[in-house]
Amino acid sequence: KKGLGVPVNNNEAFGWFFLSANQGNILANYALGHAYLKGSGIKKNYKSALKAFKYAALREHPSSRLIIGNMYYQGQGVIVSYTRAFLWWSLAQDLNIGGASQNIDMIKKKMSKDQYSKAKEMYLMCMQNTLYNCTKKLDLF
């Protein structure tokens, strides 16, 4: 990816990330998500990016949680959802990821009272379950 000792080749990097991600490597899934999100070494594919970030997020990769929130906020591969963006940013904040608090403060100002109540309810449900069970119950993907 960075060309350490070899020429930079995003296509080759994508191939290696893909192989490693398919073996369950969390950081490779995060890198794969970025590749799909940005179109680096592969055509942009928001749904595949979300799938890769989801894998990493469910295994407590904090930046993946932040990016999933961003995707819901911007409608990248999903319908824009302030409640889901708030939820994922809150889950990222729980892992002390920079930017999550600012995003939460920003989106709170844009949310209706009903949206905010639903988002808080979803967050509390996730705190009472494993994140995997929470995502299944709330159909978050």
For the regions a language model picked out, list residue spans one by one.
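Canonical positions in the second alpha-helix
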Residues: 19-20, 55-56, 92
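Short, flexible beta-strand-to-coil junctions
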Residues: 86-97
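Terminal, low-structured helical/coil segments at or just beyond the last alpha-helical repeat
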Residues: 98-141
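Short helix-capping/linker turns of helical repeat alpha-solenoids
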Residues: 2-4, 9, 22-26, 38-40, ...
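TPR/TPR-like alpha-solenoid signature
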Residues: 15, 30, 66, 86-87, ...
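Hydrophobic face of amphipathic alpha-helices that form TPR/SEL1-like repeat modules
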Residues: 1-2, 29-38, 42, 52, ...
